[in-house]
């Protein structure tokens, strides 16, 4: 097949259509988003809620979002750094923290709607695959609050942390349509879920196992990797109890605020902190002087 060079003439540019900004930036999958937000045409004023999950290097962001013409509206949000208020101070981006963050969001959403007593979810997680069902009330049968998982551009591989958030929100009392084939412990060949493996991940058992293995094999690396755990006397044996207690506290008060012992920084201090890493813009004279200095340096090196 002959090679045809793409001619970018005036006609090409006049007819060129730019893609959406967030597509150009690689932030939004509009093919998926269209299907997530499109509502049935025979429903009016019935918002379609999405459980939005995003991961950063140090945090997990979970939001309950609905889409409107003017833009997305956030009904409630929960972040993994808020887990410090419930005793979880380390490993705020692991699978167990993802589960706890999902649970925190679910309890907040239901508390705001006044449904937290009607839909309690799974109070003691055992790794079983469950979906939130309708509850019997004095006024008759009440359907649960429904949301759809929105993972953005994250990989949906088996055992991914996004499904930890989903499991936490599901156990928290929200109905999220899903199957068991993406949880840790699911065997593709037998098509069965090992509930013990999933339970281990919920309570941070995989972290505890790694801590014990590393402590035996490479003590120096263990001390450097888990230095914060060691400083706070958090041992591998105590992790399960720590997460179980955090789950109880989240259910008791999902709106608890974390109060840090460190003194609060003023606006001036934060500004000075940010300016520390920001390079000052050089003036024309400074740029010219810098170029002249480099030329002199090069000439001196050549003479040598």
UniProtKB/Swiss-Prot annotation:
Task: Establish whether keyword Magnesium is in the entry.
Answer: no
Keywords for the protein's UniProt record, in alphabetical order: Cytoplasm, Ribonucleoprotein, Ribosomal protein
One GO term of the cellular component aspect?
Answer: cytosolic large ribosomal subunit
Q: What is its main location?
A: cytoplasm
- From the Swiss-Prot or TrEMBL record, state where the protein is found: Cytoplasm
Q: Which domain of life is it from?
A: Eukaryota
Molecular function via GO: 5S rRNA binding; structural constituent of ribosome
Its annotated function is as follows: Component of the ribosome, a large ribonucleoprotein complex responsible for the synthesis of proteins in the cell. The small ribosomal subunit (SSU) binds messenger RNAs (mRNAs) and translates the encoded message by selecting cognate aminoacyl-transfer RNA (tRNA) molecules. The large subunit (LSU) contains the ribosomal catalytic site termed the peptidyl transferase center (PTC), which catalyzes the formation of peptide bonds, thereby polymerizing the amino acids delivered by tRNAs into a polypeptide chain.
Family (UniProt): Belongs to the universal ribosomal protein uL18 family.
Subunit info?
Answer: Component of a hexameric 5S RNP precursor complex, composed of 5S RNA, RRS1, RPF2, RPL5, RPL11 and SYO1; this complex acts as a precursor for ribosome assembly.
Q: What is this protein called?
A: Large ribosomal subunit protein uL18
Organism phylogeny: Eukaryota, Fungi, Dikarya, Ascomycota, Pezizomycotina
């Amino acid at each position: 097949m002959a090679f045809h060079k793409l001619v970018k003439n005036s006609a090409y540019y006049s007819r060129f259509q730019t893609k959406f900004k967030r597509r150009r930036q690689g932030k939004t999958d509009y093919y998926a988003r269209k299907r997530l937000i499109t509502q049935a045409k025979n429903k009016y004023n019935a918002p379609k809620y999405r459980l939005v999950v995003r991961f950063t290097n140090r945090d997990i962001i979970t939001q309950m979002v609905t889409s409107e013409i003017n833009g997305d509206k956030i009904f409630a949000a929960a972040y993994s750094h808020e887990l410090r208020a419930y005793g979880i101070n380390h490993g705020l981006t692991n699978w167990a923290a993802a589960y706890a963050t999902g649970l925190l969001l679910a309890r907040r959403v239901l508390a705001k709607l006044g449904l937290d007593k009607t839909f309690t979810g799974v109070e003691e997680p055992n790794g079983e695959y469950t979906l939130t069902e309708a509850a019997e009330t004095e006024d008759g049968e009440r359907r649960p609050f429904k949301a759809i998982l929105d993972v953005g551009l994250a990989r949906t591989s088996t055992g991914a942390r996004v499904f930890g958030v989903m499991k936490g929100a599901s156990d928290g009392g929200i109905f999220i349509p899903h199957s068991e084939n993406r949880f840790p412990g699911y065997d593709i060949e037998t098509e069965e879920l090992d509930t013990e493996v999933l339970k281990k991940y919920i309570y941070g058992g995989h972290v505890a196992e790694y801590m014990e293995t590393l402590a035996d094999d490479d003590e120096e690396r263990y001390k450097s990797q888990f230095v914060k755990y060691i400083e706070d006397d958090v041992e591998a044996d105590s992790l399960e109890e720590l997460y179980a207690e955090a789950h109880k506290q989240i259910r008791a008060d999902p709106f608890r605020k974390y109060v840090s012992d460190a003194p609060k920084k003023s606006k001036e201090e934060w500004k000075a902190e940010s300016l520390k890493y920001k390079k000052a813009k050089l003036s024309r004279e400074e740029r010219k002087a810098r170029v002249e200095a480099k030329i002199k340096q090069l000439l001196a090196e050549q003479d040598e």
